[in-house]
Amino acid sequence: MDTKGILLVAVLTALLCLQSGDTLGASWHRPDKCCLGYQKRPLPQVLLSSWYPTSQLCSKPGVIFLTKRGRQVCADKSKDWVKKLMQQLPVTAR
């Protein structure tokens, strides 16, 4: 195999590894839970059990509230209603 062929195979292999996220760097830096959008209306505290912050690696910083039914709801941590709920509910370790 000539040099161009070897180079082409190496580049294609590297691209496949990066795309699949199988490399150590790609999977190690991937945050577990990020918010893609935020809950717009305030949530009643009676429906919630706890909360935890999103990873600092997420593009949208937020808070994830856990409901008593086991659902997760993203909220903007800069909103007053979110700050109030964060003070009233326990933090869940994630």
From Swiss-Prot:
Residues 1-20 form the signal peptide. PROSITE patterns: SMALL_CYTOKINES_CC. GO terms for cellular component: extracellular space; protein-containing complex. GO terms for biological process: immune response. Its main location: secreted. It is found in: Secreted. It holds the Pfam family IL8. Disulfide bonds join C34-C58, C35-C74. Belongs to the intercrine beta (chemokine CC) family. Monomer. Interacts with human chemokine receptor CXCR4. Blocks infection by several different human immunodeficiency virus type 1 (HIV-1) strains. This occurs because vMIP-II binds to a wide range of chemokine receptors. May form part of the response to host defenses contributing to virus-induced neoplasia and may have relevance to KSHV and HIV-I interactions. This is Viral macrophage inflammatory protein 2. It comes from Human herpesvirus 8 type P (isolate GK18).
